[in-house]
Amino acid sequence: DNGNELTYWGNVMEPIIRKEFMNRTGLKVRQKHAMIFHEEYPYLFADVDGIVTDERGEKCIFEAKTASQYKADQWENGVPEEYVLQVQHYLAVCGMNKAYIAALIGGNKFVFTIIYRDDSLIEELIVKEKEFWEECVLTDTEPVVDDSEATQEYLLSLIHI
């Protein structure tokens, strides 16, 4: 399964990406080995790759990513949208204001950046996540099929040619 292979290599590379981030920034990343749950919405949780204490002593999220060379263009103008949304979700769950995201692209290009908390985006995410939890998970109802790229990719993955 391609997803499992991608996940496997992401897990293998995570400590290497974390170490390179620490080498380049001088910041210490502490691994986090526990799920973190939102205080108000216990069905919202985060599994962060690490916690960074920045130069001002503020605790921040650390996320490590790997990307194939085929997806390098998605990193040209910043962080791809799906990772921005993931990090904003994590910031909401953890109650933090900042995250560092580091990526190894194509196996030979290292990038990192800061993502700051966006409360208006977080509000939108929580509304959607609450809606999904109440309307789909609690009622055991499959979500409505839409015309999003993610849905199209999923449906195509079901076809074995």
Feature roles, as predicted:
Residues 159-161:
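Conserved small/polar residues in nucleotide/adenosyl-binding loops
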